[in-house]
């Protein structure tokens, strides 16, 4: 019997994994345990040890992190670095201490070097400094790869990481200050539609992004836990041809929410990196049969969830 502990299990990706393992990917030989920040302070080593003692996991999906959008990162790089370093070191140390067979941690495409060639692939993680806007978060996430390789080299551990592109879906953080681009847009569009005001979008709308639906990412995470045996990271991203501009994303949200007012772009606000195009060649070789949800359908489902759960959504 496998016992799979999911840290950060109540957030965007954790909620999606929970939904998928309770429905289409349910298996009798797996027990899944989802914990959130209310259940355990992973910055505290003793609390984390008590969690591992109580759950006794054979496998771990490590999603817990301090996360935020561009403007939140710009203001708090030190906080993002220290908090995430502490969480990651504790979780991996206890995976080793409790003889966990496999730990799959979650990185992000923003950790890659700012000055790079495209598309980005898994070999490029440490080839130069990340973008200035979120260097604290990026370096802390890169150190997971260093820890994984260290545990493999010294102890033969199979701890690995996945690198998703921009994730969105139900149970996201819709906070207008700290949320990522799509959930913040969905919230803004909802308010603009309700109040009859223009929809204000920060930046020019020209940057390009690959977006992955949280349900698709959940299905991939589960397959990685069950089937991927390498320590090297693997990028979990939609195809390069599925990259969209922020303007395209705004159009999809506007259509899904049926917003008919004016859209205004505030070009005095920062755009962040122009693009972070990632290659999913390794993923497609491993799981050639995988089908992604079309972007507009995923946006429609995400908007519907937010509208239906407006009172209780994180915002």
From Swiss-Prot:
Residues noted as binding substrate in the record, renumbered to the chain: 188, 209, 271
Listed name of the protein: GDP-L-fucose synthase
Catalyzed reactions: GDP-beta-L-fucose + NADP(+) = GDP-4-dehydro-alpha-D-rhamnose + NADPH + H(+)
Gene assigned in the entry: ger-1
Record field: transmembrane: none
Gene3D superfamilies (alphabetical): NAD(P)-binding Rossmann-like Domain, UDP-galactose 4-epimerase, domain 1
Phylogenetic lineage: Eukaryota, Metazoa, Ecdysozoa, Nematoda, Chromadorea
Enzyme Commission code: 1.1.1.271
Positions of the record's site feature: Important for catalytic activity: 108, 110
GO molecular function annotations of the record: GDP-L-fucose synthase activity; isomerase activity
Function: Catalyzes the two-step NADP-dependent conversion of GDP-4-dehydro-6-deoxy-D-mannose to GDP-fucose, involving an epimerase and a reductase reaction.
Record-linked InterPro entries: Epimerase_deHydtase, GDP_fucose/colitose_synth, NAD(P)-bd_dom_sf
Keywords: Isomerase, Multifunctional enzyme, NADP, Oxidoreductase
Site positions for Lowers pKa of active site Tyr: 141
Family named by the database record: Belongs to the NAD(P)-dependent epimerase/dehydratase family. Fucose synthase subfamily.
Pathway assigned to this chain's UniProt record: Nucleotide-sugar biosynthesis; GDP-L-fucose biosynthesis via de novo pathway; GDP-L-fucose from GDP-alpha-D-mannose: step 2/2
Pfam families per UniProt: Epimerase
Residues noted as binding NADP(+) in the record, renumbered to the chain: 8-14, 141, 164-167, 180
Natural source organism: Caenorhabditis elegans
Highest taxon of the lineage: Eukaryota
One Gene Ontology biological process: 'de novo' GDP-L-fucose biosynthetic process
Active site: 137 (proton donor/acceptor)
Class of enzymatic activity (EC top level): oxidoreductase
